[in-house]
Amino acid sequence: MSKSKDDAPHELESQFILRLPPEYASTVRRAVQSGHVNLKDRLTIELHPDGRHGIVRVDRVPLASKLVDLPCVMESLKTIDKKTFYKTADICQMLVSTVDGDLYPPVEEPVASTDPKASKKKDKDKEKKFIWNHGITLPLKNVRKRRFRKTAKKKYIESPDVEKEVKRLLSTDAEAVSTRWEIIAEDETKEAENQGLDISSPGMSGHRQGHDSLEHDELREIFNDLSSSSEDEDETQHQDEEDINIIDTEEDLERQLQDKLNESDEQHQENEGTNQLVMGIQKQIDNMKGKLQETQDRAKRQEDLIMKVENLALKNRFQAVLDELKQKEDREKEQLSSLQEELESLLEK
């Protein structure tokens, strides 16, 4: 297709939101919906040179207005048949009109400043006056503060106190008359303590020798007593052997009884482990039944919704969702049957 030279290029629309007091907003809304030709005479917008203030006249009633920046960009849509919508522009500003306000606010005279930081800060403060903290609906009140909070900056940790303490210690060391240092190893101290326990002093040797002679006399008396009582022990030796045989049989019985108790404990532990496994599988089966019931309910609601919808595209979309639910239902049924088979095999054991 050839494009004629007379065709003008398409221009992008520049749009903003106009917010009026309730009584004037209803008047403008009725005039727009009625489609009067004289709408330009009833509604006029005039902006001042600063680009932030202006005057909006509704039926020749002047309203003070201020152009503010919205928290985020919104899309503007246009429709002709109320079915198909077309995007026309991105909106980021709103003209707020009030009854009580200065129609002609005082003009701020620029002040020449040599400091670039001060001038930059002043421009930033000036822009803050025209920042709108709220959205265009009630739930979005203070949305700029709630959604766009300032992030905490990473602060580098400085340690001036530590450096000051190190300098103080170094200065005191330099002023000292003399210094002495000693390295103590933990292993060496332990060895010295062990050696100190084994080595005795020479002053104690005489006392140790006298003590050994007394112990020798006591041992001689004990051996004499033992030799005199050896005959009595021979008489009672036969009786002790019989007692030992009786004790051995009792120990064998106790050992057998202990083995049986251990076997019963092991069997009891195996039964407890099986019971816990059965309870775990039963819990999984109950959960899977709940999920399966929920999936079936969702599929039933989706089928009812498909029956009510007449739009073909929407019906196809709902049908795709229903197919996914059916596949999910089949998978859950397979999982449930496998869990039930596993539970039956455990119960048979």
Swiss-Prot record:
Residue numbers covered by motif [KR]-[STA]-K motif: 3-5
Sequence ranges of Acidic residues compositional bias: 230-247
Chain positions covered by the region annotation Disordered: 105-126, 186-212, 227-247, 328-349
UniProt-recorded Gene Ontology molecular function terms: DNA-binding transcription factor binding; histone acetyltransferase binding; nuclear thyroid hormone receptor binding; nuclear vitamin D receptor binding; P-TEFb complex binding; protein heterodimerization activity; RNA polymerase II general transcription initiation factor activity; TFIIH-class transcription factor complex binding
InterPro entries (UniProt xref): TAF7 (IPR037817), TAFII55_prot_cons_reg (IPR006751)
Coiled-coil ranges per UniProt: 244-349
Description of post-translational modifications: Phosphorylated by CIITA. Phosphorylation at Ser-264 by TAF1 in early G1 phase disrupts binding to TAF1.
Tissues with expression: Ubiquitous.
GO cellular component: cytoplasm; male germ cell nucleus; MLL1 complex; nucleoplasm; nucleus; transcription factor TFIID complex; transcription factor TFTC complex; transcription regulator complex
Keywords assigned by UniProt, alphabetized: Coiled coil, Nucleus, Phosphoprotein, Transcription, Transcription regulation, Ubl conjugation
Phosphoserine modification, residue list: S171, S200, S201, S213, S264
Primary localization class, coarse: nucleus
Subcellular location: Nucleus
Gene Ontology biological process terms from the UniProt entry: chromatin organization; DNA-templated transcription initiation; estrogen receptor signaling pathway; mRNA transcription by RNA polymerase II; negative regulation of DNA-templated transcription; negative regulation of MHC class I biosynthetic process; negative regulation of MHC class II biosynthetic process; negative regulation of protein kinase activity
Other information: Overexpression of TAF7 in HeLa cells inhibits cyclin D1 and cyclin A gene transcription and causes the cells to accumulate in early S phase. In contrast, depletion of TAF7 from TFIID complexes by siRNAs increases histone H3 acetylation at both cyclin promoters and stimulates cyclins CCND1 and CCNA gene transcription.
Comment on protein domains: The [KR]-[STA]-K motif is specifically recognized by the SETD7 methyltransferase, which methylates Lys-5 in vitro.
Role of this protein: The TFIID basal transcription factor complex plays a major role in the initiation of RNA polymerase II (Pol II)-dependent transcription. TFIID recognizes and binds promoters with or without a TATA box via its subunit TBP, a TATA-box-binding protein, and promotes assembly of the pre-initiation complex (PIC). The TFIID complex consists of TBP and TBP-associated factors (TAFs), including TAF1, TAF2, TAF3, TAF4, TAF5, TAF6, TAF7, TAF8, TAF9, TAF10, TAF11, TAF12 and TAF13. TAF7 forms a promoter DNA binding subcomplex of TFIID, together with TAF1 and TAF2.
Similarity comment text for this entry: Belongs to the TAF7 family.
Designated name of the protein: Transcription initiation factor TFIID subunit 7
Organism: Homo sapiens
Gene, per the UniProt record: TAF7
